């Protein structure tokens, strides 16, 4: 069953699954998907077409990533055509509510604040929290996968340092909630958020910021781009994140309020995709993202 689904996703690349959008608004007959195309390993832009990519609407470029793998799976399972629209992060929800797209498949977390504007599918991936750091700044024995750092250890390590993240994502909120506003009188600063994760990673690489929090697949993708200088700093995040923030480590598909038909279709389709298959698709996306450069 698993092999058939994954082979079907790969085979789908040989089919023409794209169509033009109706300027008067989208319908559920076509999956019109909004994403940044700049959020590795969930989605990014490439000039090369491959079995893993889909063309970006009204562009000569292509989108790759975990979100594209999920889009291909949904297209095959629901037997619907797909359009990929490249949008800035801050434009995703407004575009959904303006009927310019009918789905946000962009590594977006289902939060109470976003729920005020849109609905969400069931999660299509749940991740761990980790940090991106320069190898030269942190002892190699600290924050390993086998021995993740505790909250107190993180506070001590980050004392006097600056943290950075992409704007409008849960990791950026975590910086203030758990580190800048810590109760142990540690002085931890919040660097201005960057527009994308690669730009935030550049801050870490250039020494402007000390560390960047994000979902583990994102951190792994950033380290793959510069294995000589960057590494993953693992932490025992379950020991300090609230239950709501733990939920924030999962990503879901954004759907316009009232579009119950599409929401039910997406949830039924996602339920067929096992955790093992999702992990395999993400591992492939993370590996491919290393072909890009910071």
Predicted regions and their residues:
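Extracytoplasmic small-molecule ligand-binding "clamshell" domains
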Residues: 26-108, 116, 193
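Periplasmic-binding protein-like
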Residues: 37-38, 125-133, 216, 226-270, ...
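Ligand-binding cleft/hinge of the Venus flytrap
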Residues: 46-58, 71-79, 152-159, 166-195, ...
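Acidic, polar ligand-binding/catalytic clefts
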Residues: 76, 81-157, 236-246
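A ligand-binding cleft/hinge motif common to bilobed small-molecule-binding domains
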Residues: 90-97, 107-117, 173-182, 202-247
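Ligand-binding clefts/hinges and TM-proximal coupling segments of bilobed small-molecule sensing domains
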Residues: 145-147, 151-189, 264-294
């Amino acid at each position: 069953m698993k092999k058939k689904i994954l082979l079907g996703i790969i085979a789908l690349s040989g089919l023409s699954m794209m169509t033009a959008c109706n300027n008067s608004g989208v319908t559920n007959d076509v999956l019109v998907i909004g994403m940044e195309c700049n959020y590795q390993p969930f989605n990014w832009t490439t000039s090369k077409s491959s079995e893993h990519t889909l063309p970006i609407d009204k562009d000569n470029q292509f989108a790759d990533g975990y979100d594209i793998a999920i889009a291909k799976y949904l297209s095959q399972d629901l037997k619907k055509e797909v359009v990929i629209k490249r949008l800035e992060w801050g434009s995703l929800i407004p575009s959904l509510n303006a009927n310019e797209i009918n789905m946000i498949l962009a590594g977006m977390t289902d939060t109470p604040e976003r729920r005020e504007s849109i609905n969400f599918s069931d999660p299509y991936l749940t991740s761990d929290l980790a940090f991106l750091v320069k190898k030269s700044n942190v002892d190699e024995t600290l924050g390993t996968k086998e021995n993740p750092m505790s909250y107190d250890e993180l506070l001590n390590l980050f004392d006097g340092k600056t943290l950075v993240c992409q704007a409008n994502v849960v990791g950026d909120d975590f910086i203030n909630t758990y580190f800048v506003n810590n109760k142990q009188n540690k002085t931890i600063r919040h660097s201005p958020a960057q527009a994308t994760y690669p730009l935030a990673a550049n801050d870490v690489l250039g020494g402007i910021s000390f560390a960047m929090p994000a979902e583990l697949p994102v951190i792994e993708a950033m380290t793959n781009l510069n294995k000589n200088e960057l590494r993953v700093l693992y932490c025992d995040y379950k020991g300090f994140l609230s239950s709501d923030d733990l939920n924030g480590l999962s990503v879901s598909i954004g759907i316009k309020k009232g579009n119950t038909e599409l929401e039910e279709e997406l949830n039924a389709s996602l339920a067929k995709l096992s955790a093992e298959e999702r992990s395999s698709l993400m591992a492939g996306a993370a590996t491919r993202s290393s072909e890009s450069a910071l």
